[in-house]
């Protein structure tokens, strides 16, 4: 048993380029094995399919093609991320063989119970999972057909990256708050809208597993919250940080680029008028990154209503149980 190491050059194999020029470099041991069995939990249009292989077992040489602010998407419909991953997958099949990869795909009926299991070819099981999800989940644009001046929702102490550790301000506000839970913002927000996130932000960091998250929060975000700029100017810097690469490879830390990719939800700031974080435990943490905050949700709504004037419309988003679980 071992973990995939995206920086272990000796255990990576380059399979070539797709017709669109996407390079594919994957875990050598997995790709050259007689049979690769991959077990996955399908949670949204963002996950499943070839993402398991072409992200989960890939290097930055491959990941850089599709992990971009305009490509990452959770939609069940036309998903550019998975279009690229599928093109890469076709190359993997061509080079490795279509019968050497066996996928077990699961779909949860709630945070604690498996509702459906599929097994077989990657493309087939993903299509089956997508078909079932489309039957049970409305498209976001079908849920509501109007836009609002104020959008408010709570953020749980949950992140797929915080298993066996704790949340930090970056995960709470950006990754979970604007990212995983911010999908409805794209649908219901006006360009002038005020978005209110309620979360008890505190000065709590797990620097062992997230060694450069605090650094990005305190040094990069005060200067810019433009994810395109951050991606362009900081990738090479962190790829050359041998101390952080060592932490990733040998000390169970996230790869130093993980936090850079985690800034992508900040693109929503260009789609709205203002973001306010309500009810932090320690507002100075938000000050250090340049985020606005107030003491309570009530205060945030009162402020936003004064700003937007008469006939202000307010939407409170009720997120599903998958994002509201407690332990």
Positions of predicted regions on the chain:
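Structural motif
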Residues: 37-39, 149-154, 196, 315-316
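A short, acidic, amphipathic alpha-helical segment used as a generic capping/interface helix at domain edges
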Residues: 124, 128-142, 176-185, 251-269, ...
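Membrane-embedded hairpin module used as a gating/binding unit in multi-pass transport
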Residues: 78-164
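Extended hydrophobic packing segments that form well-structured cores
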Residues: 261-327
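A short, gly/pro- and small-residue-rich
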Residues: 49-70, 169-180, 216-219
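C-terminal catalytic subdomain
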Residues: 171-274
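An acidic, phosphate/nucleotide-engaging active-site surface
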Residues: 1-49
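Mobile "lid/hinge" segments at catalytic clefts and subdomain interfaces of large enzymes
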Residues: 41-42, 51-103
């Amino acid at each position: 048993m071992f973990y995939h190491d995206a920086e272990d050059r000796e255990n990576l194999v380059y399979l070539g380029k797709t017709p669109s020029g996407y390079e594919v470099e994957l875990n050598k041991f997995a790709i050259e094995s007689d049979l690769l069995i991959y077990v996955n939990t399908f949670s949204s249009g963002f996950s499943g399919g070839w993402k398991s292989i072409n992200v989960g077992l890939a290097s930055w040489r491959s990941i850089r093609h599709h992990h971009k602010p305009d490509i990452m998407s959770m939609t069940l419909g036309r998903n550019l991320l998975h279009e690229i991953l599928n093109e890469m997958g076709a190359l993997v099949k061509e080079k490795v063989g279509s019968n050497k990869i066996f996928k077990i795909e699961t779909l949860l009926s709630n945070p604690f119970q498996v509702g459906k299991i599929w097994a077989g070819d990657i493309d087939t099981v993903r299509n089956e999972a997508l078909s079932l999800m489309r039957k049970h989940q409305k498209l976001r644009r079908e849920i509501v057909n109007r836009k609002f001046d104020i959008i408010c929702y709570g953020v749980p102490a949950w992140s797929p990256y915080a298993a066996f550790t704790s949340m930090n301000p970056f995960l709470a506000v950006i990754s979970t708050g604007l990212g995983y839970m911010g999908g409805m913002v794209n649908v219901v927000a006006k360009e002038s809208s005020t978005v209110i996130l309620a979360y008890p932000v505190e000065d709590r960091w797990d620097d062992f597993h997230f060694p450069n998250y605090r650094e990005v929060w305190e040094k990069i975000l005060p200067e810019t919250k433009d994810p395109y700029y951050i991606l362009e100017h900081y990738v090479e810097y962190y790829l050359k940080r041998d101390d952080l690469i060592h932490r990733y490879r040998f000390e169970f830390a996230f790869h130093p680029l993980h936090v850079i990719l985690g800034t992508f939800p900040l693109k929503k700031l260009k789609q709205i008028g203002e973001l306010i974080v309500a009810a932090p435990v320690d507002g100075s943490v938000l000050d250090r990154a340049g985020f606005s905050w107030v003491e309570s949700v009530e205060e945030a709504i009162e402020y936003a209503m004064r700003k937007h004037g008469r006939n202000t419309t307010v939407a409170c988003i009720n997120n599903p149980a998958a994002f509201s679980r407690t332990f």
